[in-house]
């Protein structure tokens, strides 16, 4: 049975994101993936070491200075017979809220681990988010050109700490200065590593068969024998790869390599296009939407300001769930119940924009947004339903924001509301005074906000400490009890950027007391958009 042209396009798509701890090599691996997808000709110098060519996926001013990917950009490239969409996730310690939401828009994740360090804190947090939807995970053990921990130990650590079985696909031969290459367990082939070839795709020499004398000649008798001994252990002690268990999020195929040396990345990509799922069904408040449906649906998971400094615009990133986008089509924005004609949607190669004529499930569209689109918005061809599972997370850090020039209050508020709509920060306006309180998940977000207020809104602002420990969104089914709660707690209530009521607690004890005193009021740690 041949698939219709539409279903063939759906079957070709693979949409994934990379999760890692900062400095595990995520930006480098992103570049090498794009290199294999022929999206860039030579891999850029990461963090622009003495050069102007910044890593292709890091592009806001502050990122240029700090060498971190603050924003979540999207890159599409062909690989074998597939079209791959890579959603770049902010790799720095602080950008978790955006990163969490990006993970709601992918069908698969690549976990990058620094093989010298093993599982790190950030990796744990991001894995927890992928667990909410049992997202399939591939694993790349990076930095084999340095001295690493024992590979068996690394697998044990992933299994014990992240509660996912490991199925090694490739196995390293030596490491650091002695790194010779990897052996592919399922193809019975050894791929030999050459150093100093990291910027281009290299011709790799392949030795067939584990007992081939050419292997001993290529890597030395000692390393060849060590490899054979280790593989006996590996085959006895680790999981075999099983595609169904992988798709259920229960085991992860593990690849070894060095992103900087551009070695092993293609093995991982081969596995990704072969095993990762095509666009998956998604839940709405009324039903499940299948990718094969012919009516268009999609949801917004991120809003990005000023992707292009020359254009003062914002772009809403929308994941296509079903149907085909065609230029000029009319879509219903469910939240406002308004129909809009989308004639200028964008697709991305980070930093470069091009207009899209058509897009399919799994693809990410950029919609020009002049303040009318919010995170979590659903677009359909008329059906009134809303995709679920795109949350806001209660901030953990708070500052009061103050203007250097009091006359610019209006611009400040506008800037903060826009920044909160795109998820860069959350803003709370206390009901009882004129303060503006900014909430974030990590400290660096505060710096980003001040820098962006200055460059985009021409507003100079400074922070002051504020006596706020946490915030919870509040609601109550009983209107009378809710009125009483609001009356008695006015000094601790605030409206967020979307005018939702929140309780601002001065301490965790204060929050617990309020929850005990008002059992009918619900205090929410996350809020569905």
Swiss-Prot record:
Write down the SUPFAM superfamilies for this protein, in alphabetical order: EF-G C-terminal domain-like (SSF54980), P-loop containing nucleoside triphosphate hydrolases (SSF52540), Translation proteins (SSF50447)
Cellular compartments annotated: Cytoplasm
Q: What is this protein called?
A: Peptide chain release factor RF3
Is Repeat one of the keywords?
A: no
- Principal localization? cytoplasm
Q: From the UniProt record, which GO molecular function terms apply?
A: GDP binding; GTP binding; GTPase activity; guanosine tetraphosphate binding; translation release factor activity, codon nonspecific; translation release factor activity, codon specific
- Which UniProt keywords are given for this protein, alphabetically ordered? Cytoplasm, GTP-binding, Nucleotide-binding, Protein biosynthesis
Residue ranges of every copy of the tr-type G domain listed in the record: 11-280
């Amino acid at each position: 049975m041949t698939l219709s042209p539409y279903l063939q396009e759906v079957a070709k798509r693979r949409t994934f994101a990379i999760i890692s701890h900062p400095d595990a090599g995520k930006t480098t691996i992103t570049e090498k993936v794009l290199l294999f997808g022929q999206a860039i000709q030579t891999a850029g110098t990461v963090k622009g070491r003495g050069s102007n060519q910044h890593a292709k996926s890091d592009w806001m001013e502050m990122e240029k200075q700090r060498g971190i990917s603050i924003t979540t950009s999207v890159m599409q490239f062909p690989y074998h017979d597939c079209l791959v969409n890579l959603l770049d996730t902010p790799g720095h310690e602080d950008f978790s809220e955006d990163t969490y939401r990006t993970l709601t828009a992918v069908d698969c994740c690549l976990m990058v681990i620094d093989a010298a360090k093993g599982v790190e804190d950030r990796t744990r947090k991001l894995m927890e988010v992928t667990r909410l939807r049992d997202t399939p995970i591939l694993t790349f053990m990076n930095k084999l050109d340095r001295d690493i921990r024992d590979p068996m130990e690394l697998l044990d650590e992933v299994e014990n700490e992240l509660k996912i079985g490991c199925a090694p696909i490739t196995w390293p031969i030596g490491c650091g200065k002695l790194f010779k290459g990897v052996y592919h367990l399922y193809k019975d082939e050894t791929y030999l590593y050459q150093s100093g070839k990291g910027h281009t795709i290299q011709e790799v020499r392949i030795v067939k068969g584990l007992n081939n004398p050419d292997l001993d000649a290529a890597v030395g008798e000692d390393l060849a024998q060590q490899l054979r001994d280790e593989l006996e252990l590996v085959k006895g002690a680790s999981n075999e790869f099983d595609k169904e268990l992988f798709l259920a999020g229960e085991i992860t195929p593990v690849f070894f390599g060095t992103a900087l040396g551009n070695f092993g990345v293609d093995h991982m990509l081969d596995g990704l296009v072969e095993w990762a799922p095509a666009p998956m069904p998604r839940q709405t408040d009324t039903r499940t939407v299948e990718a094969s449906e012919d009516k268009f649906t999609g949801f917004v998971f991120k809003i990005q300001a000023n992707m292009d400094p020359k254009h003062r615009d914002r772009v809403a990133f929308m994941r296509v769930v079903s149907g085909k986008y065609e230029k000029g089509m009319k879509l219903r924005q469910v939240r406002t119940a308004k129909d809009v004609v989308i004639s200028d949607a964008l697709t991305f190669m980070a930093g470069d924009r091009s207009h899209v004529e058509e897009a399919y499930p799994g693809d990410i569209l950029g919609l020009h947004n002049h303040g009318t689109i919010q995170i979590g918005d659903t677009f359909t061809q008329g059906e009134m339903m809303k995709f679920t599972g795109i949350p806001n997370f209660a901030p953990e850090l708070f500052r009061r924001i103050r203007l250097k020039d009091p006359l610019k209050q209006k611009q400040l508020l506008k800037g903060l509301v826009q920044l909160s709509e795109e998820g860069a920060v959350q803003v709370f306006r206390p009901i009882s005074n004129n303060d503006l309180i900014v909430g974030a998940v990590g400290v660096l977000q505060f710096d980003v906000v001040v820098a962006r207020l200055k460059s985009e809104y021409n507003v100079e602002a400074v922070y002051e400490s504020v006596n706020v420990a946490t915030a919870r969104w509040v609601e109550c089914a009983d209107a009378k009890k809710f009125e009483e709660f609001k009356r008695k707690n006015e000094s601790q209530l605030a409206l967020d950027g979307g005018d939702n009521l929140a309780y601002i607690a001065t301490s965790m004890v204060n929050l617990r007391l309020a929850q005990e005193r008002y059992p009918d009021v619900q205090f929410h740690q996350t809020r569905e958009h």
